Design a protein with these regions (language model features):
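N-terminal metal-binding scaffold of metallo-dependent hydrolase/deaminase domains
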Residues: 1-48
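Divalent metal-coordination and catalytic microenvironments
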Residues: 16, 31, 36, 59, ...
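Hydrophobic faces of well-ordered beta-strands that scaffold small-molecule active sites
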Residues: 67-71, 94-96, 148-152, 192-194, ...
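Acidic-and-aromatic substrate-binding clefts and catalytic sites of carbohydrate-active enzymes
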Residues: 75-78, 201-204, 229-234, 258-264
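A short acidic, amphipathic alpha-helical/loop segment
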Residues: 81-87, 91, 208-212, 240, ...
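Hydrophobic, small-residue-rich alpha-helical packing segments that form membrane-like cores
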Residues: 99-106, 114, 120-227, 231-240, ...
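Polyanionic/metal-chelating signatures
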Residues: 105-126, 134-137, 144, 155-169, ...
Length: 326
């Protein structure tokens, strides 16, 4: 999805230092933008006819917009059509629908669950309702200030067909989930994400997830995963990712990857030897943020939803068992 462009769409950015991402040397030049297209990098001089002119502050750099390959921005995009903090950093493309937990693609019951479970990350969908990929695209059409790509979400789709059921999807549920992936791709989704630390995404095993992700192969789209394991266990997490890719016949991508370099290299070499196209993104700092329950509570305690989890934690006996590591 592309942003809406102002009238006049032809704009000259004048007085900057151009870093085009191709050459090693910057150059002093002006940049002519025509809607979504860079129409030219031109020598300093009088502006072309019929274009707006923006005079840049001394020392300004003109460069291609940055891509945030992993962002939770559904809420501000639906509400305002933009993410101001990202724009201020030069981010012009956002990839949402991450970690298998987006209310884009949700049925109303799933949206209500995500409003309780994941709203601190994605924002809430109010009122909770069915919101397909096509419906989201329609809701933001003509209002965007940034390019937006949407991933379908495996956990969302799993909740649509099975709620918080911990067991494997039965054949009918698998077929229903696969149809949802096919429809999301037809509606413009650019891949399928999962979040194997989150519920109910983590309840899907390799065979199930590969079957649900199978439509990606024909569409040429990737399977993008928040792994089940990072750090000391990252090799196992990447092996599972590669197994899903092999089963689905799709390219795979590891979200916010971290671990020991030797472990990462071995896992990537193993994936390549198995014929799996594996890529990754990584953030440049040592801290992250997520849902506290993911880190501290066993999955079985969360399996009936946030309200039931809070009720269980109110029981002194349950708290004692947790503190004892039982």
């Amino acid at each position: 999805m592309q942003p809406a462009y102002p009238d006049p769409a032809r704009t000259l950015l004048r007085g900057g230092l151009v870093a085009d991402g191709i050459g090693e040397v910057t150059q002093r030049a002006d940049v002519l933008v025509d809607g979504p297209v860079i129409a030219g990098v031109i020598a300093r001089g009088d502006p072309p006819a019929e274009c707006a002119v923006i005079d840049l502050a001394p020392g300004s750099v003109i460069c291609p917009g940055f891509i945030d390959a992993h962002v939770h921005a559904e809420g501000p995009l639906l509400a305002a059509g933009r993410v101001d903090g990202a724009l201020a950093q030069g981010v012009t493309t956002l990839v949402v629908g991450q970690d298998g937990q987006s209310w884009i693609g949700a049925m109303a019951a799933t949206a209500r669950y995500l409003n309780e479970y994941f709203a601190p990350v994605n924002g809430a969908l109010e009122p909770a309702r069915d919101l397909s990929v096509a419906a989201f695209r329609g809701a933001v059409s003509g209002r965007l200030a940034q390019n937006v790509a949407v991933l379908a979400s495996q956990g969302t789709i799993r909740h649509n067909v099975a709620g918080l059921d911990r067991g494997p999807l039965d054949p009918g549920q698998r077929a229903a989930a696969r149809r949802e992936v096919e429809q999301a791709l037809a509606d413009g989704a650019v891949g399928l994400s999962s979040g194997l630390d989150y519920l109910p995404s983590r309840f899907g095993g390799v065979a199930e997830t590969a079957a649900v992700a199978a439509p990606l192969a024909a569409a040429g789209r990737p399977y993008v995963s928040h792994l089940r394991a990072y750090g000391p266990q990252v090799a196992a997490g990447l092996a599972e990712l590669a197994a899903v890719g092999a089963g689905a016949g799709a390219r795979v991508h590891a979200s916010h990857l971290w671990g020991a370099p030797a472990d990462l290299r071995a896992a990537f070499e193993a994936a390549a030897a198995a014929g799996v196209d594996l890529s990754y993104d990584m953030y440049p700092y040592r801290r992250s943020s997520t849902v506290l329950a993911m880190l501290l509570l066993p999955p079985e305690l969360q399996a009936r939803g946030p309200a039931a989890t809070l009720a269980a934690l109110a029981d002194p006996r349950q708290r004692a068992r947790l503190l004892a590591g039982e």
